[in-house]
Amino acid sequence: MPFTQVSVFAMSGGKIQTSVECAPGEVGLLAVKGPHITPGYVDPSHNAQSFADGWFVTGDLGRIDPDGRTYLTGRAKDVIIRGGHNIDPLMIEQALLQHPDVQLCAAVGQPDSYSGEIPVAFVQLAPGSTISVDNLLNEIRSSFQEPAAIPKRLYRVDSFPMTSTGKILKPALRQKAAETAVMEKLNSIVPSGTSLEISFQQSGHQETLHLRLPANTAPDVLGKVREAVTSLRIPFNVSQA
């Protein structure tokens, strides 16, 4: 379209850096500018994440080749941010799909107290495969040039949640990864046999984890639970029932 500017910028902490334009072929966050671009949303609260220095941030990851062709490679919301490293989940998924024992896979970020997020992957093995997830992880390690991108864990699944268009439903996998991280934190805090309920609620761009404990949970245990989940740096609330 005439008068359209398209550029790919670097990311830092999941946010666009319009002062750092990516080199040809380098993957970054795609942004567009032009007279046909909307000046903003009716709800101004959405503008902060969608506009930067006059650019409309598409939310897509992409690259521009030396001839000016634009290629989309993924979604920015799927980027895994591990201790300041921006990890494209596609890098992990491609390494896994090259293995003959993998039929389908998806990589997501799992909350982590130290790194903020760690890369993990859910894997559906090929029919008849008996490989363990530990052996599978060891066999794909050499595929990664960036050590931070090596998944910390692989979770085996029999099937994936899918969208109506046949795509893997990654938000559901991120919730499962977060739930697993929370439960691992609480295993040493909450008495064995305690009934725990975990759910998620979406509000705008933010997803909140809701944790419900029994009404008779001791105050000191509640305090430790809040401290443990806070360390994962995810929005949450705790209630009793």
Model-derived segments and their meaning:
Residues F3, V27, D67, V102, ...:
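Active-site lining segments that contact anionic ligands and/or coordinate catalytic metals
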Residues V6, D60-I64, A107:
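A structural signal for short hydrophobic beta-strand segments in well-ordered beta-sheet cores
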Residues V20-L90, L97-Q98, Y114-S115, P147, ...:
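Conserved ATP-binding/catalytic segment of the ANL
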Residues L96-C105:
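Short acidic amphipathic segments
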Residues V27, A31, T73, P89, ...:
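Hydrophobic face of alpha-helices
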Residues F3-T4, D53, T58-G59, Q103, ...:
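Short loop/turn microsegments at loop-to-beta-strand junctions
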Residues I80, A106-D112, V120-Q124, L137-A241:
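Conserved C-terminal "lid"/linker of ANL adenylate-forming enzymes
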Residues M1-A31, P66-D67, S129-V133:
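Conserved beta-loop-beta connector loops within the AMP-binding
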